[in-house]
Amino acid sequence: MTATPREFDIVLYGATGFVGKLTAEYLARAGGDARIALAGRSTQRVLAVREALGESAQTWPILTADASLPSTLQAMAARAQVVVTTVGPYTRYGLPLVAACAAAGTDYADLTGEPMFMRNSIDLYHKQAADTGARIVHACGFDSVPSDLSVYALYHAAREDGAGELTDTNCVVRSFKGGFSGGTIASMLEVLSTASNDPDARRQLSDPYMLSPDRGAEPELGPQPDLPSRRGRRLAPELAGVWTAGFIMAPTNTRIVRRSNALLDWAYGRRFRYSETMSVGSTVLAPVVSVVGGGVGNAMFGLASRYIRLLPRGLVKRVVPKPGTGPSAAARERGYYRIETYTTTTTGARYLARMAQDGDPGYKATSVLLGECGLALALDRDKLSDMRGVLTPAAAMGDALLERLPAAGVSLQTTRLAS
């Protein structure tokens, strides 16, 4: 909660990047009367972005801010109700802006999928942000809004029915079309590089509760692997015949969901277990893909987290998409995702949440989700939680997002299943 009115409802920082431009385009369409400004290192490049946005954005002010110059971030944060940032990898560039927003009592939303960055943000700035009234909300894109909000919706459905707390909860990516942005790949490489160079970070990354506000208070529920391969019928009867394998974003998404549960005072339940997998179909080859794919994925992740530092950085950069690059508009329009999340409660009741969105998940869908998170923080303040500090999307604005996202083309429906 800011002490005095701010000049801007939202400042979009990183507007010249690929996803930054898409987010600016979305805000120009959906921002309504919100007072929006664009920010970046180069005034000329930001001006060029604004000129391409159409008439509604031509009066948006331009701010100059640079991650290497903390004073510019502080000045930007002091003028904004909310700062929305697409400038990553966040491990490398993110903490100075978190610091500026925490000090100024300014709400913040980003796209990070980097657990160690989030852990550092929590350790360094959670208390200060709570004291100043800032909401620092990480993972506001495809990772991890669909995962986080689906479970939050299931919790609401079970609570309204008086059906008890959530126990085994499994998210399955049923279908997915699209790629991962250059920025997302850069973030993944940053995670692996951090783990490779720092044994303590590698140990923390292996902890399913590494983002918990109180690690000692978390229940011991046995192994919770990040990249499991499972038969669908083990997850839910409705998935009989389907095989699943590990989902690449699960190591981040699962930790966000578990942090949400803890921030909400374990409202989902003390026996809440959460996993994510991706459907590989029901063909005769599906079991092979599930088992081999899962084994290879776990092996590659384990090796990369230890030895990626030995690869020449120039070689790595040549073989992965560059940050700021992405597919054509037509390709982005062809993308989509469909996820299903199944849960069983302590009373034996079963529920399903289906979430779907059109648009490439790493680009178009992410820009919509980030834009809506920024708008919720700025405009729906009476619907936000009372919590302050370093939060998750569900803990900070779960109710506001459940109300806001359908109008943005995001479908999320919960159903009670036969027990």
UniProtKB/Swiss-Prot annotation:
The chain crosses the membrane at residues 284-304. GO terms for biological process: glycolipid biosynthetic process. One of its GO terms (cellular component) is plasma membrane. Coiled coil: none annotated. It comes from the Bacteria. Its EC number is 1.3.1.-. Residues 197-232 are annotated as: Disordered. It is found in: Cell membrane. One of its GO terms (molecular function) is oxidoreductase activity. It is a single-pass membrane protein. Keywords: Cell membrane, Isopeptide bond, Membrane, Oxidoreductase, Transmembrane, Transmembrane helix, Ubl conjugation. There is a cross-link at K127 (Isoglutamyl lysine isopeptide (Lys-Gln) (interchain with Q-Cter in protein Pup)). InterPro entries: NAD(P)-bd_dom_sf (IPR036291), Saccharopine_DH-like_oxidrdct (IPR051276), Sacchrp_dh_NADP-bd (IPR005097). Belongs to the saccharopine dehydrogenase family. Enoyl reductase subfamily. PANTHER family: SACCHAROPINE DEHYDROGENASE-LIKE OXIDOREDUCTASE (PTHR12286:SF5). This is Putative trans-acting enoyl reductase Rv2449c. It comes from Mycobacterium tuberculosis (strain ATCC 25618 / H37Rv).
